[in-house]
Structure formats: structure tokens, C-alpha cells
Amino acid sequence: MSTLKKPDLSDPKLRAKLAKGMGHNYYGEPAWPNDLLYIFPVVILGTIACVVGLAVLDPAMLGDKANPFATPLEILPEWYLYPVFQILRVVPNKLLGIALQTLIPLGLMILPFIENVNKFSNPFRRPVAMVVFLFGTFLTIYLGIGACLPIDKSLTLGLF
């Protein structure tokens, strides 16, 4: 018994579907029972085995007890909030810092109207979007690194 069903190209119904661009899943390996009964449980049990194995072989150690009277000099947020924290820390007016953060999604919403190109076209043929996203990526990395440094070195990253 074969696991793959070969298409019968002499079938007029299949040829009509193929002529319309349909019928591509008329043949092939069925999802039931092959995937749902055999492959999915193996992947699920393998994932559980990896998690349990890592938990047994390398358990997470508990750190020191929290002391509310011994706080660090500067409390940092989680790593994914470093760029936002840096904007709020560097901009002198906090309302201006929040306004700068609202300009980011507004600019991304306006971007498709500035560059009127087919959305399915090659991304390398969309220069405005490429420049905006690359600038945003590098600015986010720059602000994230700067948030880890003291405030007097945060804008220059301690290089100047």
C-alpha cells in the first residue's frame, strides 16, 4: 500500500479543476490519520520530554531573598522596554517623550500612503519602507544599549 495517492490525470474532473487552478490538494498524503494520530503525538511527547529533561538536569536555582531596603541605584525595566525607557529618560519633557512614542505607530500607518507600491512587490524595490524600517531597527538597538548605561553616557554610549 502506498502512502501517496498519485493523481489520475486522465480523470476529466481533475483536469478541469487543474485548468482552473484548483485541485492541488485533490491528491497527496492525507492529514487523517497520518498527521493527527502519528506525527502530532510524537512531537508533543518529544517536547514534553525535552522540557522535563531540562528541568531535571539543570534546575533553576533560587536567588537571594528580596530586601526592600537595599534597592539598586537605577532600576531598569525588562529588556524589551529599554528603548522606550531611554526615550522617556533622555527627553526633558515627559509629555514630549510620550508624544514621540505615539509618532512611531502613526508614522508606520502613514508609510503605505507615502510609498504607493504594490504590497506584494519585492521589499527591495520599496526604498522608503526599507530606509524607515532599517533606521527604526538601528535606532531601537541604539536606544536599548543606551538605556543600560548611566544617563550621562547614554546618548554617546560612552564612546565620546
Curated annotation (Swiss-Prot):
Keywords: Electron transport, Membrane, Photosynthesis, Thylakoid, Transmembrane, Transmembrane helix, Transport. It is a multi-pass membrane protein. Its main location: membrane. It comes from the Bacteria. The keyword Repeat does not apply. It is found in: Cellular thylakoid membrane. One of its GO terms (biological process) is photosynthetic electron transport chain. One of its GO terms (molecular function) is electron transporter, transferring electrons within cytochrome b6/f complex of photosystem II activity. It holds the Pfam family Cytochrom_B_C. CDD domains: cytochrome_b_C. The 4 large subunits of the cytochrome b6-f complex are cytochrome b6, subunit IV (17 kDa polypeptide, PetD), cytochrome f and the Rieske protein, while the 4 small subunits are PetG, PetL, PetM and PetN. The complex functions as a dimer. This is Cytochrome b6-f complex subunit 4. It comes from Prochlorococcus marinus (strain MIT 9515). The gene is petD.
